[in-house]
Amino acid sequence: MRCKMKFIVFEGLDGSGKSSLMAALERELQNRAINFLRTREPGGTPLGDEIRNMILRKEGPAPTPRTELLLYEASRSQHVDQVIRPALAAGTWVLCDRFAASSVAFQSGGRAISEADVVMLNTFATGGLKADITVLLDLSVEESRRRRQGRGAVTGETEDRIESEADTFHENVRQSFLKQSREDAAAWIVLDARETPEVLFKQLLQSLTERKVL
């Protein structure tokens, strides 16, 4: 049923255009009078935002890979319980910037933690909740870095601890996203993030229509 609430997640390297594409989909949902909630991970709740700052800040001691994973999962558990599940139960669509696939990509792909362990913790933190559709904006590491640097030159913002990781880390993250998309192709939409925002939205809308989401 096309009007049923949907949980749509946007994934990709930093600078891939997730925010712009989410904003375009928001406008489409508004035009169709579909109630929606936009949120993000890590964060999405007051406690989650505190955890986000702990993970991403450069100041102070960095968490070990396992600690980092557990912090992400703690934020996710709070987010699912307090925000995502209540919204879905109320019939509201949820658009989320990153979710469980990011933990597989960053903590397993990037940090080399066992994928089985990450998946197990994802399942525990979410209570088994999965995205209906995951939209992957695929972008090369080089282009991701170029866009991040360009953004920083305009805003004056510096890169966070994760963004500052080496290119090899980000390439492993990218390849993990692509691997996940191949293994669950029916639930993933992969877009070439080099395209213009207009083309990307047109492709997304077409894919959502073909899958009877919209």
Swiss-Prot record:
Annotated catalysed reactions: dTMP + ATP = dTDP + ADP
Gene Ontology BP annotations: dTDP biosynthetic process; dTTP biosynthetic process; dUDP biosynthetic process
Any one GO molecular-function label of the UniProt entry: dTMP kinase activity
PROSITE patterns: THYMIDYLATE_KINASE
Matching InterPro entries: P-loop_NTPase, Thymidylate_kin-like_dom, Thymidylate_kin_CS, Thymidylate_kinase
Enzyme class: transferase
Keyword NAD among UniProt keywords: no
Keyword entries, A-Z: ATP-binding, Kinase, Nucleotide biosynthesis, Nucleotide-binding, Transferase
Binding positions (ATP): 12-19
Enzyme Commission designation: 2.7.4.9
UniProt record similarity statement: Belongs to the thymidylate kinase family.
Biological role stated in the UniProt entry: Phosphorylation of dTMP to form dTDP in both de novo and salvage pathways of dTTP synthesis.
Name of the featured protein: Thymidylate kinase
Organism listed in the record: Bdellovibrio bacteriovorus (strain ATCC 15356 / DSM 50701 / NCIMB 9529 / HD100)
